[in-house]
Amino acid sequence: MSNLKQHKQALFCNDNEAINDYETAMHNAVQAVSAWLKNEKMYTGGSIKQMRALISGFNPTKEGMGVQKSLDHLVEIFLNPSLKVHHPHSLAHLHCPTMVTSQIAEVLINATNQSMDSWDQSPAGSIMEEHLINWLRQKAGYGEGTSGVFTSGGTQSNLMGVLLARDWAIANHWKNEDGSEWSVQRDGIPAEAMQKVKVICSENAHFSVQKNMAMMGMGFQSVVTVPSNANAQMDLIALKQTLAQLKADGKITACIVATAGTTDAGAIDDLKAIRKLADEYQAWLHVDAAWGGALLLSKDYRYFLDGIELTDSITLDFHKHFFQTISCGAFLLKDPENYRFIDYKADYLNSEYDEAHGVPNLVAKSLQTTRRFDALKLWFTLEALGEDLYASMIDHGVKLTKEVEQYINDTPDLEMLVPSQFASVLFRVVPKDYPAEFIDALNQNVADELFARGEANIGVTKVGDKQSLKMTTLSPIATLENVKALLTQVLTEANRIKDDIKNGTYTPPID
């Protein structure tokens, strides 16, 4: 016989005792998070070896330990050693501090557990998402409409962009015997197209372009990368030459993927110029604005995105410079007719009958079926804070970056590697008279040492053949004084370990 009382206590439901238990557990969870926030250390977990020792396995029992005891355990092994992304020294990645409104929205999203694949599973959310997509389209210059959908993030949105572009290009270049356009959805990819159809992006584009084309069966060989200029933007001369060469070789450029905010340098490609070339070669233009799309709300830097309205599709991520909790992204499509390449009717979800009666059909716009109502986070934030405060928070990081760049240029033993553009600083430590062959190792280990001690999270990447440190200065609460203090730590740490590295007596903290 089932124990319904225990079932109700375990389930989120309208049982009075279950509601009381929920309120108590949520209160305790919030208290634990508040205590974690008050600990000013950025990270307390130590090295990877220390973390593996702390989390040595997963061994649930048949009886269970109870909610409170399990919560206490999770505070110990998960919450306390988690990275504090709001800390002003947590600057390694596009990993943002989050809005309070986003945190509150998560409670509502989780409590209601709506699914966006059909209107009857999310009656309010489906309509709200359509309105928010319409608002985003107008911000981007696409005009009114609902052609777009919320996604899990940039990789999925980029997949939608290159997928639709490929199928659009094949429909334009391959025909059936009766003269109708070829449908990849119905008939698969023509054998000839596997070698002919290409996608172009810059060498600094997100790796998801290659990854997605491989998942689509086209392989890495279908992606042609072009060099970047000194500012890490797509080189327009190289792009024009690449387009011409591909055409001369009998290839078809299905899509040019531009970037508005490269992962490392924050570079924003010249969208207007790329649009002209895309038109000349009849190519789709997709822009990966996962990061730079935040400038749609900017007061001072919106012009960085001039030309975004000319693209065919756009990737946006709200869990980057929009300060929303992970995950929250969107894909915008200019021409709704191009959704035909992925449209599918399932009678139990999006029947033609429902569509004829004005029922929202979001599943036809998405690669996902079951999908969270993540749009609520952005809706709540915009409605609560307003566009002016949002713009101020977005612009803060861009202004801070310029100040940090000037400080680095004025500081001995520090060197900028790429001029700052958006909210990223690529630099390195170069001690005077230090042997060049040890510079890369020095910078790598400075970052590793500071992270292992919980003092800073600085990114490590490559600029050409040089090992670079990276600070993603998007935090709306970080100050120049915070960054100066961090750079002082960087120089102090470099001075501490540089001789041991040179002499071969240094042991990296990651070992």
Swiss-Prot record:
It comes from the Bacteria. It is an enzyme of class 4 (lyase). Its cofactor is pyridoxal 5'-phosphate. One of its GO terms (cellular component) is cytoplasm. Pathway: Amine and polyamine biosynthesis; 1,3-diaminopropane biosynthesis; 1,3-diaminopropane from L-aspartate 4-semialdehyde: step 2/2. GO terms for biological process: carboxylic acid metabolic process. Its EC number is 4.1.1.86. GO terms for molecular function: carboxy-lyase activity; diaminobutyrate decarboxylase activity; pyridoxal phosphate binding. Keywords: Decarboxylase, Lyase, Pyridoxal phosphate. PANTHER family: CYSTEINE SULFINIC ACID DECARBOXYLASE (PTHR45677:SF8), GLUTAMATE DECARBOXYLASE-RELATED (PTHR45677). This is L-2,4-diaminobutyrate decarboxylase. It comes from Haemophilus influenzae (strain ATCC 51907 / DSM 11121 / KW20 / Rd).
